[in-house]
Amino acid sequence: MDKSESTSAGRNRRRRPRRGSRSASSSADANFRVLSQQLSRLNKTLAAGRPTINHPTFVGSERCKPGYTFSSITLNPPKIDRGSYYGKRLLLPDSVTEFDKKLVSRIQIRVNPLPKFDSTVWVTVRKVPASSDLSVAAISAMFADGASPVLVYQYAASGVQANNKLLYDLSAMRADIGDMRKYAVLVYSKDDALETDELVLHVDVEHQRIPTSGVLPV
């Protein structure tokens, strides 16, 4: 072997990477990408903050409390005369109520007016006695005592009013799914008669995850 061949062979040997160095670098890059993705998700979660009545939707899994999901029910108030009231107890699906000891953290009501809506309604959620028949007199008294937040939803000619949600926090009360039958959504039609096809109420109940939560919004 002449000198040039020896030099070339030495150069080639120096270029050869160490055994395993390439795979170690790839593994480090992959770990860095995973960490970056996790930090990105964390930043998005922190930026979103806790759900408030100003969020365009209630909560997805990243906005629920850790270990929580939510179930939704829809209420269609019947015709309500001017100055009169409507009340409906919260009845969750059987697949949820069988886990009656799971804690509930929040209830949110979203008001969805239909095209004919051109009135003003007051909406609240209250814990009511089991003996209550949700009569007009009983509901009127609950609106008047100031014990619960009230959403005043008014007709907006330009479309849906921005403030169309009411958030009710039950965390301090340690309420559970079994307690939900003790709560009711109450509506007061202040200025006009409300027709049956004018308003829809979506009620979101945030609760601890249950075994069937795979079919619930997450």
UniProtKB/Swiss-Prot annotation:
Q: Where is this region: Disordered?
A: 1-29
Q: Where in the cell is it found?
A: Virion
- Per the record, residues carrying N-acetylmethionine are 1
Give the superkingdom in one word.
Viruses
What InterPro entries does the annotation carry? Cucumovirus_coat (IPR000247), Cucumovirus_coat_Asu_sf (IPR037137)
One GO CC annotation:
T=3 icosahedral viral capsid
Q: What's its job? A: Capsid protein. Probably binds RNA and plays a role in packaging.
The protein's name is Capsid protein
Annotated source species? Cucumber mosaic virus (strain As)
What's the source species' lineage?
Viruses, Riboviria, Orthornavirae, Kitrinoviricota, Alsuviricetes
